Design a protein with these regions (language model features):
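Sec/Tat signal peptide C-region and signal peptidase I cleavage site
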Residues: 11, 29-33
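Intrinsically disordered, low-complexity, compositionally biased regions/tails
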Residues: 12, 21-22, 185, 371
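Short intrinsically disordered, low-complexity coil segments enriched in acidic
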Residues: 1-3, 27, 58
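Eukaryotic scaffold repeat domains enriched in small/polar residues
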Residues: 34-374
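Bacterial N-terminal signal peptides that target proteins for export
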Residues: 3-20
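Bacterial N-terminal signal peptides
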Residues: 18-28
Length: 374
């Protein structure tokens, strides 16, 4: 009996000691979590919360393209309000998130262009300083905006998906200098596109067009818009595509975002197939950078991923969502001359600005888009 009592007393003593220790541990968990928890959602960058200020209350337009000429002149392309998607964020004029969600404002089977704000220019604070509304009748959707890096006049080029055209504007937006393709007329020949998506330049002014959502090809033109060559067909094999969404160039190669086939295909400048990088998860944008890397936006997972020139994954960051710093269809991105990254966060109806963190590893930063030496 004595042994039993001693055993029982010791047992209960240990139980209470254990409970006290457990209570102390539980009490300490929140403090520990605050010190050591969390997720690194924005990689080597800090997001500038609420940077985009549309100046319009109840902004509900998808932002699908962005090009940073410099930190004080950032071009964005927005989809017409009549193509608004239901259930996405609404923004206040000052960029704050409103409580409501977007509503469909059109019949999906009867698209009629109605509203404006297709091409806007923002300053360093994210405020609208230019609205190219003078071109509303010419532009239906500025799916890709790019400034020719080899042109001393810095012409602004627009890939107008719904009008099936490429447009070249003077830098100040006062002149329409060149039209490639026939307005509103889709096709698959030397003079027509069908839902083109983007383009990239070579030093001689020639350019490659990702054509695109309906056609499955890459088309090359000279600097005056004269057709030179094309390649590609619908499919899953080499040199075949399923939604050619983005193109990039370096001194010897062309990189093509074969979006729905989840891969990057690589070609020489004449369209000869060289290689492919599978498993890239719905890439909407591919760029080559000055530090000899290839960066993509992999929108299935909300990731930005950097590769070496042989296709080896080096670094990735980002996730899906609508909070500041995360994305839902990062349709385009660009880097300014100060290293800031701008993301056309399409389904969240905004453009986001990311600035490098203090002391960030430079190897993890997205470099400036490559300008090939002449």
């Amino acid at each position: 009996m004595k042994l039993t009592r001693i055993f029982w007393e010791d047992f209960m003593k240990n139980i209470f000691a254990g409970v006290s220790l457990a209570a102390l541990l539980v009490a300490a968990i929140p403090a520990l979590a605050q010190e050591k928890g969390g997720l690194d959602l924005t990689g080597p960058y800090d997001v500038v919360v609420g940077w985009f200020k549309p100046g319009i209350e109840g902004w509900d337009q998808r932002v699908v393209s962005v090009n940073a000429e410099d930190p004080n002149r950032v071009f964005i392309g927005a989809v017409d309000r009549n193509d608004t998607r239901e259930g996405h964020p609404l923004l206040a004029a000052n960029g704050a998130l409103l409580k409501g969600k977007t509503a469909v404002v059109r019949d999906n089977n009867n698209f009629t262009k109605g509203d404006v704000n297709n091409i806007l220019v923002l300053n360093a604070d994210g405020k609208v300083i230019e609205n190219w509304s003078q071109w509303n009748d010419e532009v239906s959707i500025a799916h890709h905006i790019i400034i020719d890096p080899y042109d001393p006049a810095h012409a602004v080029w627009v890939v107008d998906r719904f009008n099936h055209r490429i447009l070249k504007f003077s830098n100040d937006g006062k002149q329409l200098l060149l039209k490639v393709g026939e307005k509103g007329v889709p096709g698959n020949d030397e003079g027509h596109f069908h839902d083109p998506a983007s383009l990239t330049f070579l030093p001689d002014g020639s350019f490659y067009v990702a054509d695109g959502y309906t056609n499955s090809r890459v088309v090359k033109f000279d600097k005056n818009g004269k057709y030179l060559l094309s390649w590609g067909s619908k499919g899953t094999g080499p040199s075949q595509f399923s939604l050619v969404h983005s193109v990039a160039a370096d001194a010897n190669r062309i990189y093509v975002a074969d979006r729905n086939n989840d891969r990057i295909q690589i070609f020489d400048h004449n369209g000869k197939f060289l290689d492919q990088w599978p498993g890239t998860a719905r890439v909407t944008r591919v760029i080559t950078t000055e530090d000899k890397k290839v960066w993509v936006s992999a929108t299935r997972y909300g990731r930005f991923a950097g590769y070496d020139l042989n296709g080896k994954l080096l670094y990735q960051w980002g996730t899906l969502g609508d909070d500041p710093g995360v994305t839902d269809n990062a349709h385009q991105f660009d880097v300014d001359n100060a290293g800031n990254v701008y993301v056309a966060d399409a389904n969240n109806n905004r453009v986001q600005k990311f600035v490098p963190k203090k002391g960030a590893d430079k190897a993890h930063l997205i470099g400036r888009e490559l300008v090939v030496k002449k």
